[in-house]
């Protein structure tokens, strides 16, 4: 990135926000790092005031309500954070001629497919989380013509709730029950952060799927986490309805990074 460009990362204390910060902090860019305590993205005036005062060249929205169960329990809060927040940031980006980067999810698909979803497949979310994130995508497209939307899946790394839960149970030697009928692509937060930065720098505006390589079930993912931990803890495959560590998600939400391949990124 060019010297003195300003990058505003909203949700800077989250998994992806932290990794982006680590990757950019020793570069010539000026980082503007906020979380809800500094700027509440659901407050349109606070967002406009901060953007107007700091005039970022990029606004990266890593903030969001990502707890799927919590979204189901509080629909209004989910849409307020994931949709209205994205709208507020998009409006600020348009007003300041900044480029808007929106992080989204595989949950925008219904899981009924049997082949990986591309950027050209029609979303049909079944959860409040997925619906609120899709609404956020639509607001970004409506209010800011200079935008990149990044969909990813099963993001793991420092602070990952599922990863941490499995590691904790493995450390305690407790039997782990994991869904064998939920399949997607685990994606490292570091890998995702690197690709987002690359897209910010050189990619045309639009929608991109960005995931790791190779799909697996929650059960297989848990098995690999336990293996890496060195634990001998038993991992038992169960149906998603019996998996207490994760909320209901699409049964199949493997993303195909088609636009990355076609764009040579």
Regions found by a protein language model. Name each.
Residues 138-184, 189-191, 197:
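NAD(P)-dependent short-chain dehydrogenase/reductase
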Residues 44-81:
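NAD(P)H-binding glycine-rich loop region in Rossmannoid oxidoreductase-like domains
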Residues 25, 31-49:
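Adenosine-cofactor binding site in Rossmann-like domains, unifying the SAM/SAH pocket
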Residues 80, 84-88, 108-150, 155:
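Catalytic helix-loop patch of NAD(P)-dependent Rossmann-fold dehydrogenases
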Residues 251-265:
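C-terminal amphipathic/interface module of NAD(P)-dependent oxidoreductases
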Residues 6-24:
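N-terminal Rossmann NAD(P)H-binding glycine-rich loop of SDR-like oxidoreductase domains
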Residues 195-196, 202-247, 251:
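Mid/C-terminal beta-alpha module of Rossmann-like enzyme folds, strongest
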Residues 73-101:
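NAD(P)-cofactor binding segment of oxidoreductase domains
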């Amino acid at each position: 990135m060019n010297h003195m460009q300003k990058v505003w990362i909203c949700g800077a204390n989250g998994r992806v926000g932290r990794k982006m910060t680590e990757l950019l902090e020793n570069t010539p860019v000026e980082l503007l790092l906020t979380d809800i305590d500094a700027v509440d993205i659901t407050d349109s005036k606070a967002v406009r005031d901060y953007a107007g005062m700091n005039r970022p060249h990029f606004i990266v929205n890593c903030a969001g309500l990502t707890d799927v169960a919590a979204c189901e329990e509080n629909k209004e809060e989910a849409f307020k954070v994931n949709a209205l927040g994205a709208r507020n940031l998009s409006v600020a980006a348009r007003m300041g001629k900044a480029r808007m980067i929106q992080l989204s999810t595989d949950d925008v698909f219904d899981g009924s497919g049997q082949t990986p979803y591309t950027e050209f497949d029609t979303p049909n979310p079944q959860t409040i989380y997925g619906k609120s994130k899709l609404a956020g995508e639509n607001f970004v497209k409506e209010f800011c013509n200079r935008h990149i939307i990044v969909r990813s899946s099963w993001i793991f790394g420092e602070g990952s709730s599922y990863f941490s839960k499995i590691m904790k149970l493995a450390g305690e030697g407790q039997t782990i029950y994991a869904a064998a009928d939920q399949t997607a692509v685990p994606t490292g937060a570091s890998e995702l952060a690197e690709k987002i930065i690359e897209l910010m720098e050189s990619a045309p505006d639009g929608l991109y799927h960005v995931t790791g390589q190779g799909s697996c079930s929650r059960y297989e993912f848990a098995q690999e986490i336990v293996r890496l931990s060195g634990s001998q803890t038993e991992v038992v495959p169960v149906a998603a309805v019996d998996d207490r560590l994760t909320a209901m998600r699409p049964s199949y939400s493997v993303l195909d990074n088609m636009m990355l391949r076609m764009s040579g990124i």
